[in-house]
Amino acid sequence: MQQDKVNLLGLNQKAIEDFFISIGKKKFHARQVFKWIHKKGVIDFDAMTDLGKNLRHKLKDKAQITIPKVVFSKASKDGTHKWLIDVGGSAVETVFIPEEGRGTLCVSSQIGCTLNCSFCSTGKQGFNRNLSAAEVIAQLWIAARTLSKTDGEHDFTVTNIVMMGMGEPLMNFENVVPAMDIMMDDLAYGLSRRKVTLSTSGVVPRIYDLLEQSGVSLAVSLHTPNDMLRNEIVPINKKYNIDELLEACKLYAQKGPHKHITFEYTLMEEVNDNLSDAEELVALLKSREVPAKINLIPFNPYPGTPYKKPSNNRIHRFKEFLQHNGFVTTVRKTRGDDIDAACGQLAGDVMDKTNRKQIYLKKLGDTNAN
């Protein structure tokens, strides 16, 4: 029985070196191939011109470099790009957001999500499976190749990665960490730990593991300073409450790359956007002595949600109070809403746990017909 070929795309530098040793080849050959794949975007062994003929033949026999198919890509009028990527009959989305001086790629880690946060459209679509390391890094590979070919008024260079797409990345730790290793490898994409940010809803034990094994920048989806409300809107809080979460955050801030934690706070009208909520948030972060930046995210409504986006006045009042109390506070701009790429809209039109396959196939058929 023929052994399955190893997909080299998802192997970090150590893993690809180990693979080359296992087939009787040298580590420096592994580094050559690693660079061809990620730095140069080459996935055909025959096109890797500095490899010997025998090595290329061996690789074709033992390995492959498989890139998922892009079902479609869209560009927004504001420069935002969105890709729908086929991952074995299901689909995930990847979004690139250009800003002055930077370009941020939002990467997915799971097909669906297990956490079922009450305000998140992805969580309402159910959970299929974790992405492999190859499927995670493929999102950056595809974006880097696509954007390098795009001309226009925007700068299409990926300078930052945020693991904030579909899924809870710390629930797919074993695949996300190797993928982030590749993102930060100088032979690949060369991003620093400060430029790669993982966003978690609060899988506390894995926060400690992340600090030990990766140390990328950390963002935490807090959304409320109140355990009672957080139990309702972020159910994982029932397992790891705010006190436990902030204890982990405090240590991460001390040893991580930024010396602070970014707290994400989705503002929902009359749910968590009152001045009393802002007061409680300030008191909480100051009492726990967690160095913090706060990113306010106005809620993006989707069909069937009971939540509403606050008025601009309520958003401004909340922000002003936090800033007045010494916290660097930003309000996330809605980007790519004309292509359903804004935060909270990821894959909402293609991921449905009752008819995911049918909707995906219809989308694929519509794309092929164009």
From Swiss-Prot:
Residues 99-337 form the Radical SAM core domain. PANTHER family: 23S RRNA METHYLTRANSFERASE (PTHR30544), RADICAL SAM CORE DOMAIN-CONTAINING PROTEIN (PTHR30544:SF5). This is Dual-specificity RNA methyltransferase RlmN. One of its GO terms (cellular component) is cytoplasm. GO terms for biological process: rRNA base methylation; tRNA methylation. Disulfide bonds join C106-C343. It catalyses: adenosine(2503) in 23S rRNA + 2 reduced [2Fe-2S]-[ferredoxin] + 2 S-adenosyl-L-methionine = 2-methyladenosine(2503) in 23S rRNA + 5'-deoxyadenosine + L-methionine + 2 oxidized [2Fe-2S]-[ferredoxin] + S-adenosyl-L-homocysteine; adenosine(37) in tRNA + 2 reduced [2Fe-2S]-[ferredoxin] + 2 S-adenosyl-L-methionine = 2-methyladenosine(37) in tRNA + 5'-deoxyadenosine + L-methionine + 2 oxidized [2Fe-2S]-[ferredoxin] + S-adenosyl-L-homocysteine. Belongs to the radical SAM superfamily. RlmN family. It comes from Francisella tularensis subsp. holarctica (strain FTNF002-00 / FTA). Specifically methylates position 2 of adenine 2503 in 23S rRNA and position 2 of adenine 37 in tRNAs. m2A2503 modification seems to play a crucial role in the proofreading step occurring at the peptidyl transferase center and thus would serve to optimize ribosomal fidelity. The active site is at E93 (proton acceptor), C343 (s-methylcysteine intermediate). The keyword Methyltransferase applies.
